[in-house]
C-alpha cells in the first residue's frame, strides 16, 4: 500500500520548468505611428479638436513606437460609429469582435509554438489562456481548445482582465503546473485585441489618449514543461523563480473598468516613478538567493508600458542602454500589447542571441529577469536561466 507522500513524489517533475517553444502573431492591418494622429482624428470625427490633435501628435512622437498592428480597420470602424465616439454605448459591438478574434489570433501564435516544439498537440496536458478583453462563457480557452483540436481532457485555466502584468503571471502559473505534474506540457497563450479600449479623444480624459497612442494587438504562445526529452525537445529558458507583489502607495495608479462604453482606461502620471522607485527591492528579493546584485550582469525582459517607464528604470538602476534593447525593439515594432509583450521580447531575445552568435539564449549571459507591470499596481518578477546555444 503506497502512502500519500510516495504518490506526491511520483507526481512531481525532477527539473525546473523550461520554455520549449515560442510563437507570435499579429493582425495583418499595420498602422504607421507617424501618420496615426491624422487617421485617428479623422476616423473619430474629431478633426475640429486641433489643440488636442497636436497634443496627441506629441504623444505619438514621444512613444518610441514606429508601428503597431490593429484588428480594427477603417472599414470595421465605419461600420461601428459608436466605437469611434468618446463615450457611446458600444459594449455589444466590441464584444462581438473580440469574443471571436481573440481566440483566432491566439490560435495563430499557438500553431507556430507547437510547430517549433515538434511534438504532437495531443501531448499538451494544460492550457493557460490570458486576455484583457472579451469575457465570455465558455471562454477563449474553450474556443482555442476547439480551434486547435486539443484533447477534450486538457486542463484549462482562463485569465480575463488582468492587464499588462499578466505575461509574468502566466509564466508563474505555468512553472507551478509543469513542476508539480510530471510529464505536463503547458500551452500558454496571451492574445490581446484593443477593440475594447479604442475610443475617440476627449480633453477631459488625457490618460485614455495615452492608451490610444501606445496600445497594439498581438498574440504570443509558449510551451512550458519540465525534464525536456533529449534530442526531441529544445529548451530555450528555464523558469527559476516567480513572485508577485503590490507596490506601496500605488492604489488607483492604473485602472481599467468594463462599462457600456467598453473598457475605460485610467492612468496616473506617476506610474513610471512608482515602478522605478520600487524595482530595486523586487530585484534584491529575487536575486539575493543567487548572490547577484549587479543588474548589468543579467539579461532584461521588461514589459514596455511606455518609454517613460523604461527610461526611469534604466536611470534608477544605472542600466547600460543595451540592457533594454530587446524590450525597446518590441515596443518600437509592435507598441504595448499588454500581456503578450514580454513573450514577444523573450522570442526577440533568443532569436537575436542566435543571430549575433552569442553563447546563450539570454544575450550570452546566464541569468535574467522578466518583469510585468500593470493594474494594482502589480509587479510580476520572474527569474530566468538561459540555455547554451
Curated annotation (Swiss-Prot):
EC class: transferase
GO biological process, one term: polyketide biosynthetic process
Lineage, opening ranks: Eukaryota, Viridiplantae, Streptophyta, Embryophyta, Tracheophyta
Source organism of this protein record: Catharanthus roseus (Madagascar periwinkle)
GO molecular function: naringenin-chalcone synthase activity
Function: The primary product of this enzyme is 4,2',4',6'-tetrahydroxychalcone (also termed naringenin-chalcone or chalcone) which can under specific conditions spontaneously isomerize into naringenin.
Domain of life of the organism encoding this protein: Eukaryota
Protein's name according to its UniProt entry: Chalcone synthase
Gene this protein is translated from: CHS
Pathway assigned in UniProt: Secondary metabolite biosynthesis; flavonoid biosynthesis
InterPro entries: Chalcone/stilbene_synt_C, Chalcone/stilbene_synt_N, Chalcone/stilbene_synthase_AS, Polyketide_synthase_type-III, Thiolase-like
Family: Belongs to the thiolase-like superfamily. Chalcone/stilbene synthases family.
A Pfam family this chain is assigned to: Chal_sti_synt_N
Catalytic center residues: 164
Catalytic activity of the protein: (E)-4-coumaroyl-CoA + 3 malonyl-CoA + 3 H(+) = 2',4,4',6'-tetrahydroxychalcone + 3 CO2 + 4 CoA
Keywords (A to Z) from UniProt: Acyltransferase, Flavonoid biosynthesis, Transferase
Membrane-spanning segments: none
Amino acid at each position: 500500500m503506497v502512502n500519500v507522500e510516495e504518490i506526491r513524489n511520483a507526481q512531481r517533475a525532477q527539473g525546473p520548468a523550461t520554455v520549449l517553444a515560442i510563437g507570435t502573431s499579429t493582425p495583418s492591418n499595420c498602422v504607421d505611428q507617424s501618420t496615426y494622429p491624422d487617421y485617428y482624428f479623422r476616423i473619430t470625427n474629431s478633426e475640429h479638436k486641433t489643440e488636442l490633435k497636436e497634443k496627441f501628435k506629441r504623444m505619438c512622437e514621444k512613444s518610441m513606437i514606429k508601428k503597431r498592428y490593429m484588428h480594427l480597420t477603417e472599414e470595421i470602424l465605419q461600420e461601428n460609429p459608436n466605437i469611434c465616439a468618446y463615450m457611446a454605448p458600444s459594449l455589444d459591438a466590441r464584444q462581438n469582435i473580440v469574443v471571436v478574434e481573440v481566440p483566432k489570433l491566439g490560435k495563430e501564435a499557438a500553431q507556430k509554438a507547437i510547430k517549433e516544439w515538434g511534438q504532437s498537440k495531443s501531448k499538451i496536458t494544460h492550457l493557460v489562456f490570458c486576455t484583457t478583453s472579451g469575457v465570455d462563457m465558455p471562454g477563449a480557452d474553450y474556443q482555442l481548445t476547439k480551434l486547435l483540436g486539443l484533447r477534450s481532457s486538457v486542463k484549462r485555466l482562463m485569465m480575463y482582465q488582468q492587464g499588462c502584468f499578466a505575461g509574468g503571471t502566466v509564466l508563474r502559473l505555468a512553472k507551478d503546473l509543469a513542476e508539480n505534474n510530471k510529464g505536463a506540457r503547458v500551452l500558454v497563450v496571451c492574445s490581446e485585441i484593443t477593440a475594447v479600449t479604442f475610443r475617440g479623444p476627449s480633453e477631459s480624459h488625457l490618460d485614455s489618449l495615452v492608451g490610444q497612442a501606445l496600445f497594439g494587438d498581438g498574440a504570443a504562445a509558449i510551451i512550458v514543461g519540465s525534464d525536456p526529452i533529449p534530442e526531441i525537445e529544445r529548451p530555450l529558458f528555464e523558469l527559476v523563480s516567480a513572485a508577485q507583489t503590490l507596490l506601496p502607495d500605488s492604489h488607483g495608479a492604473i485602472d481599467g473598468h468594463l462599462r457600456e462604453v467598453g473598457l475605460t482606461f485610467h492612468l496616473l502620471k506617476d506610474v513610471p516613478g512608482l515602478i522605478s522607485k520600487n524595482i530595486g527591492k523586487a530585484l534584491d528579493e529575487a536575486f539575493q538567493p543567487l548572490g547577484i546584485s549587479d543588474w548589468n550582469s543579467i539579461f532584461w525582459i521588461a514589459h514596455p508600458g511606455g518609454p517613460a517607464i523604461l527610461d526611469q528604470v534604466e536611470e534608477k538602476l544605472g542600466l547600460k542602454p543595451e540592457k533594454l534593447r530587446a524590450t525597446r525593439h518590441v515596443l518600437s515594432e509592435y507598441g504595448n500589447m499588454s500581456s503578450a509583450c514580454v513573450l514577444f521580447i523573450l522570442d526577440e531575445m533568443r532569436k537575436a542571441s542566435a543571430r549575433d552568435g552569442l553563447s546563450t539564449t539570454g544575450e550570452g549571459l546566464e541569468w535574467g529577469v522578466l518583469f510585468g507591470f500593470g493594474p494594482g499596481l502589480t509587479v510580476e518578477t520572474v527569474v530566468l536561466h538561459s540555455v547554451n546555444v
